[in-house]
């Protein structure tokens, strides 16, 4: 039986669920304050902000795809200020070197010895702007740091600060002078979030806000310690066996659509990896926590499915020719795969 918000027939100890709900609601109130503070600076984009928070709480990284000028830098800066963590923007260019990100050894004449000069990777929030403009060596250096949460500089290993979130951006339009991220490396991002243009009303609000002389300042709501606490607590959010079965069937449908009577085989070159199943569960837990629940419901899975799966489904040539997108495939799967 699936756990739902209005379902009293839990398949685990009711007291455990009740305690998780109580703690989740307390954490959710704090998270609501975070969203409220962010909205002082960021107009609209509520779903984008929520999904970035989902990635952060689930201890994952984000690939942001949007055209230039949609306030990605302001978004990263605002979120980091509200969370009381450090942030840095790294502009990826063809001449960037791994040492420019990680750091290097520098000879100090005064001490007559080499000292480690740490790079910008030693911040909590990293905005890797236009990651696909840097050569593969630089991309690999960043992606290894994302995976291991540590870097090695001239044989010396340094653990990165926690929390650690990389928000990498890429432009969906321009391809000249770019290096395509390998599919295996893209898979390391927990979520791929698409940022769209603001609505007319939101754009009016943006114009009015920038026309005003009053600067929208935000204040820290929590500290990095609280972020880590949220990350740890989200791991304890309850997931029913039926939810796990639901997730595995969704992911399997990207690999073997014919087993679910889905006519998608010719559109998919390769389906999602097992990492997709793990991130569907982890991000759904984070979303449940944000909404003040101590357990995951099917709607949580559906809500994060596009962001978790869209960059993990490798489309076939036929799909490209027929302009079939990964999101369309995910829509079809979600419409046909039901929880049991």
Regions found by a protein language model. Name each.
Residues 23-70:
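Pre-Walker A (pre-P-loop) alpha-helix and adjacent loop at the N terminus of AAA/AAA+ ATPase modules
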Residues 20-28, 41-42, 192-264, 290-294, ...:
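Conserved C-terminal "switch" segment of AAA+ ATPases
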Residues 108-113, 130, 134, 138, ...:
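Canonical AAA+ ATPase core
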Residues 56-93:
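Walker A/P-loop
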Residues 50-54, 107-127, 156:
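Conserved alpha-helical scaffold flanking the Walker A/P-loop in AAA+ ATPase domains
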Residues 66, 129-130, 141:
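Walker B catalytic acidic pair
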Residues 89-121, 140, 177-186:
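Conserved AAA+ P-loop NTPase core
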Residues 2-20, 24, 258-340:
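C-terminal engagement/docking regions of AAA+ P-loop ATPases
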